């Protein structure tokens, strides 16, 4: 009986630890998660060097967050191929931007992920627009015309295209309108000096009450993939582990019944 209880305890602990790891990541409705995504983006946008004359204040967009969540749940280390025409995933934006961060769950935070994107500034020359390595994440974060953001983080046992990682956090932000066109990410100049008409200046950013409203959409269509598909790897993992748990208990009971004097040494 001691062997049986030990086996059950180990299996329950294993499955519980997996479930706990998956559940510690915030959902797209989590207020702290939303505030962090918006705050950190705007922090970096307000601090650009050289200073920006036309940098728009960025606010949350639930539809963009749903798009990010739907794509993140596929656990693929690649960009969504439907963000630009002829596809149209968002009711207001024709073209969307996207940044992806993937890493282990313990080191994930909204701040660390967005900071990682922004740190690409070290390889970007604003004057010449020459990038030494990868700079697209940075330029999207500080793209002046992108004024809406929606992010999601997904727990992935495996990430396709990132085979070295197991049990990772897959963090995606989508932006509207998308940036990264062959031009400068913003206009250089005195802060807020080139804001749109009727805008005000707040922390070096152009703000507009109407533009900055958080809108919810109820008729957004995501062709070809559901809004909240359950990750197939997560589902398979949980099913297999449940079966293993049941079989382990049955086998242990049968072995003890057949060999009642069996003793296991610690």
Swiss-Prot record:
Keywords: Membrane, Signal, Transmembrane, Transmembrane helix. GO terms for cellular component: azurophil granule membrane; extracellular space; membrane; plasma membrane. The keyword Signal applies. PROSITE patterns: CRISP_1 (PS01009), CRISP_2 (PS01010). CDD domains: CAP_GLIPR1-like. Residues 38-175 form the SCP domain. Coiled coil: none annotated. Disulfide bonds: none annotated. It holds the Pfam family CAP. It comes from the Eukaryota. Residues 1-21 form the signal peptide. It is found in: Membrane. It is a single-pass membrane protein. Its main location: membrane. GO terms for biological process: sexual reproduction. InterPro entries: Allrgn_V5/Tpx1_CS, CAP_dom, CAP_sf, CRISP-related, SCP_GLIPR-1-like, V5_allergen-like. The keyword Transmembrane helix applies. According to PubMed:8973356, it is ubiquitously expressed with high levels in lung and kidney and low levels in heart and liver. Highly expressed in cell lines derived from nervous system tumors arising from glia, low or absent in non-glial-derived nervous system tumor cell lines. Also found in fetal kidney. According to PubMed:7607567 it is expressed only in brain tumor glioblastoma multiforme/astrocytoma and not in other nervous system tumors or normal fetal or adult tissues. Belongs to the CRISP family. This is Glioma pathogenesis-related protein 1.
